[in-house]
Amino acid sequence: MSQNSLRLVEDKTVDKSKALEAALSQIERSFGKGSIMKLGANEKIVEVETVSTGSLSLDIALGIGGLPKGRIIEIYGPESSGKTTLALQTIAEAQKKGGVCAFVDAEHALDPVYARKLGVDLQNLLISQPDTGEQALEITDTLVRSGAIDVLVIDSVAALTPKAEIEGEMGDSLPGMQARLMSQALRKLTGSISRSNCMVVFINQIRMKIGVMFGSPETTTGGNALKFYASVRLDIRRIGAVKDREEIVGNQTRVKVVKNKMAPPFKQVEFDIMYGEGVSKTGELVDLGVKAGIVEKAGAWFSYNSQRLGQGRENAKIFLRDNPAVADEIETALRQNAGLIAERFLENGGPDANDSVGLDDA
C-alpha cells in the first residue's frame, strides 16, 4: 500500500515538473527568452546598485548605502526644506561616478550657480523646462527608454500642470486631472525604469487638507499613484538654523525615511545644510563619529586616534575640512560599521499619522 502511494506521489511530481517546463517554454516562445526565469538563476538580479545622497547618515539610514537605481524615489517636504538641494547632491554624486543625469525643471526655478556650488557638472547635466505636465512626462519617458540616463530628477510634481488646465481659463475646476496624469505616466514608466536601471526622483510639495479633525492635515500633491510606485519616500524638514555668531549660515535638517522597500523604514537622521555648500559632510562625520565611538569627545574637545581635532564642533569641522585624509579615514570606519550605526544610533521615527494618510487628488 505504501509503495503504491509513494509511486503516486512520484508520478505527480514528474507530471508537475513536465507541466512547468511546458508552460515555461510556451511563455518563452510567445514573449522571448528571459521573459520568465528562476530568481536565483541570475545573481545580478539580487544586487541593487545605489547612488549616494551626499549625506553619510542618510545613506546609512537607507540601509543599502544610498538611493537604489532602477527605482522611483519621492522627496517631499515644506518650502525651503532642502528637497532640491538633496536631489542636486544625488546628481553630483552620480556624476562623480561617471553617470549621466537629467533635470526636468517643471517649476522653471533651477539656479545653475547654486547647482555648481553643490558639485553638479553643468556641462554634462541635461535640463528640460517643459510647458505642460504631459510634455514633461513624455520627455521623461523618452530619456528613461534610451537606457543612457542614470539619475533623472523631476522638480516638482505640483508643477506638472495638465495641458487642459493651461489652455483653460483661470478659476476652471478640473478635479483629479493631475492625479490621472500621474497615474497613467507611472504605469507607463515603471517597467522602463526597471529595465534601464535609471533612478527617477520626484520632488513633491505639501498641501493642507481642510476639515481634518484627527491626524495630520498634511498631504502631498499628484494623487495616490506615486505613493504606491515609489520604492523610497523621504520626508525632509527644516528644524532649526545653523548660526555663526548672529549670522544664519545654514539649516538644521531632519529627514525621515517614510517608506523603504529595500530595508527597514522609519529611520530618522539629522544633518546641517550649509548655504552655498550643501550637506555638511564634516559635521556628519563629527556627529556620527561621536555616536559610534570612533571620534572621542572629552568636554569640548574632539579627538580621533589620540589626535586632537579641535575644541568645539565647529573647530573640529574646520580641521576635517583642512585634513581630508583624516576625514576619509573616519568615513571609511563609519561605512564599515554602517549596520551597527543604523541599528543602535539612528533614531527610529516610527510611523505617524502623516505617513499613512492617502494623498489628495489635486
Curated annotation (Swiss-Prot):
Location in or out of the cell: Cytoplasm
GO annotation, biological process: DNA recombination; DNA repair; SOS response
Presence of keyword Transmembrane helix: no
Domain of life: Bacteria
Sites where the protein binds ATP: G77, P78, E79, S80, S81, G82, K83, T84
GO molecular function, one term: ATP-dependent DNA damage sensor activity
GO cellular component, one term: cytosol
Principal location class: cytoplasm
Gene3D superfamilies: P-loop containing nucleotide triphosphate hydrolases
TM ranges: none
Keywords, sorted A to Z: ATP-binding, Cytoplasm, DNA damage, DNA recombination, DNA repair, DNA-binding, Nucleotide-binding, SOS response
PROSITE patterns xrefs: RECA_1, RECA_2, RECA_3
UniProt keyword DNA-binding present: yes
Family in the record: Belongs to the RecA family.
Biological role stated in the UniProt entry: Can catalyze the hydrolysis of ATP in the presence of single-stranded DNA, the ATP-dependent uptake of single-stranded DNA by duplex DNA, and the ATP-dependent hybridization of homologous single-stranded DNAs. It interacts with LexA causing its activation and leading to its autocatalytic cleavage.
NCBIfam families: tigrfam_recA (TIGR02012)
Protein name in the entry: Protein RecA
Source organism of the structure: Allorhizobium ampelinum (strain ATCC BAA-846 / DSM 112012 / S4)
Name of the gene encoding the protein in the UniProt record: recA
